[in-house]
Amino acid sequence: MGWLRIILCVVLVLTMVSLAACSSSTNGLEQVRVAEVTRSIFYAPLYVAVTKGFFEEQGLEVEITTAWGGDKTMTTLISDGADIALVGSETSIYVYQQGTDDPIINFAQLTQTDGTFLVAREEHDSFSWDQLNDSVFLGQRVGGMPQMVGEYVLKQHGIDPQADLELIQNIDFSNIPNAFASGTGEYVQLFEPQATLFEKEGIGHIVASFGAESGQIPYTVFMSKQSYINDNADTIQRFTNAIYKAQQYVYATPTEEIAEAILPFFEDTDLDIVISVINRYAEQESYAPTPILQEESWLLLQEIIDQAGELEQIVEYDTLVETRFAEQAINQ
């Protein structure tokens, strides 16, 4: 968990900097800064909430920045560079394990499965997981949710990631696709739309879904510092209201309309690719239907973290999960 040392260093550097948690824009809307871990169709409901005006209906103007990695996203949140982070719940556990007077609270779940796919360099007429034995596997960052879920799934199929694979984990998150495209690895774990783009370009072939294999977990969740939630409970509520409306929209709307709604966030991606990716995620129910983070999912998350050797102690559900905003959004 070397990334935590990076966070602590950055926070120390920024202790002299005071940033406003939120402010009013010229159009009278309250500004909320969101740091997302990556830009992905996996997060479609967030972008729907922006383009369909659901945040604006709640009196909010949401500014989204992409941090490109869980460590960078959490650094941004802790150092007050963002009010809300969209990132894996494991990051809140890591911060809690290090000791903090201002824990990171998960208040609204966005996705409920892993969002990565196994991409093979060579096409397979039929795929079985044991074909990965003795292969070169380009994985994700140690301690990150993609890598931990990947290892969990491999173990479920009788593969020891450390002993049965040549596992590469020293490549920065944002550079993993380029590394695979340049010839590194026989298999790679990728998010969409990169996996589908590689398949379309003949660089690789999607052979399995880690999300379909791993079960339901709080994979990406909106979270904020406890202090921000205490001081801005109404803002958090209105933000959650908009997210829930977007979640309902995604489940009730034809894929083509969803794709058109989020296309402004993916200007370099063809509409047919966006449609294909949304369908892929919808089929495996990756989009959470409500913002409520369930306790059983929280426990499975920690089982996965524990198997990866990154969990120091079980963190109780009520310690880092707050469901009152999601419940009110649903029941209002």
Where are these regions (language model features)?
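C-terminal motif of bacterial Sec signal peptides marking the signal peptidase cleavage site
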Residues: 18-21
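Secondary-structure end/capping motifs
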Residues: 230-312
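Short, glycine-/small- and polar/acidic-enriched structural segments
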Residues: 28-162, 167-170, 179, 186-192, ...
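Soluble non-cytosolic domains of exported or imported proteins
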Residues: 67-71, 86, 140, 144-145, ...
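Pocket-lining segment of extracytoplasmic ligand-binding domains
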Residues: 91, 173-266
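Bacterial signal peptide processing site
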Residues: 23-25
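Conserved C-terminal helix/tail region of periplasmic/extracytoplasmic solute-binding proteins
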Residues: 301-332
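Bacterial N-terminal signal peptides that target proteins for export
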Residues: 1-8
